[in-house]
Amino acid sequence: RSTVPARTSTDGENFDDNRPQPRTARAADPETTEAAFRIAGKNLPEGEILNYVQSWIKEDKSTFLKNALERMDTPLAELADALQRFRHGGVEEGDLSTATQIGLRAALVRRFLTDQLEFVNIAKDYLTVADFHELCQRIVYPPRSHGRLGGKAAGLYLASKIVARSP
């Protein structure tokens, strides 16, 4: 039986064939940015451009939480810190795009509760980022823990939020 050696990056980091490679940051090109704003200025009212820029800034302020959730090796303590930072960062969940809201909720469900698709699909409609911040204040976990709540606890937590939000 032969094995294929793991691919490595130029800095020696191993890449699993079934995982995406890390994103590379692209520097902002001033000419492209100016051209985009010039075209927008010709086709959109100033107020609408300002609204778009403000929404992009708010989306950008949630990037650290998205990044923490995407890294599967992020300990629960760091996720709790990222949730705390998000809560006090001046951005409300409702300020974000619907896609970002749902993405954050689904990622939080997968990291704290379960990765069962049926559960995630239901939970993302009922649980909010604020719910997970509140949850972090109530659970006890070791500093480097990567675990989740048990199945019964996850189900009871979701059920309590569904009942609380029902008319």
Which residues are covered by each model-predicted region?
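N-terminal beta-alpha lobe that positions the nucleotide/phosphoryl donor
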Residues: R1-P167
